[in-house]
């Protein structure tokens, strides 16, 4: 009889001490749900993290995306192949040239087109400039969000110098829309290479100073070493690429494993971590910046003379004297602008090594001047998908450095 009359939940007035665990389970008094985002300075984009806590331990975390969705893939179906470029800028807006060149490379592969050698060098130079700016933002923000304001200022000072050089090359600091199918729309400005060499000299000094403030800093090391750990096997299962995968000990970089453009002509190393934690991800990015500087110096010192775009009026705009002086030139110009490049029917997948990993493009053409389908495999989505696996059961304080070092960019994740 006593058992049948016993209430389902303990009476908090009389049984709190005797049945504390049952009471907690019934009333959920020890757990709290907080929101990180969708507008939060540490999320690197408008993403919401719904975090369930027990004390300061993360019991469950649920990433919610969609706040930055712009309909990228559908938008590309309504414009010409060239007009897709401004949309690609806004995927990873910290390294827009990598998006531009990756898309153009896939279109050229679909056409079966090889671009001039000088244009390939220009693409390598632009890509490595933006790899530097992306990594500087990631490393600087990681230090800032753990209390290190000086490293952030050093990173931003170097990044500003790089933005100045980028603006001289492309006409824009961030969203560049640089390059065209068949090569480049601009050549390197006169006197630009010596200015970049000087910028890299200044940047190396800033990089050394930033490393001195972070790498052996006890607070930074305690917050990053042994936190945010993911094994190489799990990273591969989730689809990790780029610095996050290499920090786990996997030596995979498309520039080495499947070289494109002229990367196979340069002497550079691929930094690989060991433990797959936040500290290794920081170290990998730090060393990648030094390797990018090596590549830039070699590319600028050995860039050949020659054309920067193919001499084919079906692909590239005719020279202005031909447009103004010949009927063939003006007709080719008009058809290319109004109808777009007529890409042969077919499909292709092509990938380049972007700052955060493999940036893959799956393109389908039906033979017209507009894409039938554009799908982008962004490196940020797999690293975000693995956040619950990495962080559940860990401390709330570990979430910020983990989210910083995986460097999820909302623009490429949500498209």
UniProtKB/Swiss-Prot annotation:
SUPFAM superfamilies, A to Z: HydB/Nqo4-like (SSF56762)
GO molecular function: NAD binding; NADH:ubiquinone reductase (non-electrogenic) activity; quinone binding
Membrane protein topology class: Peripheral membrane protein
Keyword annotations of the record: Cell inner membrane, Cell membrane, Membrane, NAD, Quinone, Translocase, Transport, Ubiquinone
Pfam families: Complex1_49kDa
Enzyme kind, highest EC tier: translocase
Gene3D superfamilies listed in its UniProt record: Cytochrome-c3 Hydrogenase, chain B
UniProt subcellular location: Cell inner membrane
Reactions the enzyme catalyzes: a quinone + NADH + 5 H(+)(in) = a quinol + NAD(+) + 4 H(+)(out)
A single GO cellular-component term on record: plasma membrane
EC number of the protein: 7.1.1.-
Cited InterPro entries: NADH_Q_OxRdtase_suD (IPR001135), NDH1_su_D/H (IPR022885), NiFe-Hase_large (IPR029014)
Known role: NDH-1 shuttles electrons from NADH, via FMN and iron-sulfur (Fe-S) centers, to quinones in the respiratory chain. The immediate electron acceptor for the enzyme in this species is believed to be ubiquinone. Couples the redox reaction to proton translocation (for every two electrons transferred, four hydrogen ions are translocated across the cytoplasmic membrane), and thus conserves the redox energy in a proton gradient.
Quaternary structure and partners: NDH-1 is composed of 14 different subunits. Subunits NuoB, C, D, E, F, and G constitute the peripheral sector of the complex.
NCBIfam families per record: NuoD, PRK06075.1
HAMAP family: NDH1_NuoD (MF_01358)
Protein family membership: Belongs to the complex I 49 kDa subunit family.
Protein name from the UniProt record: NADH-quinone oxidoreductase subunit D
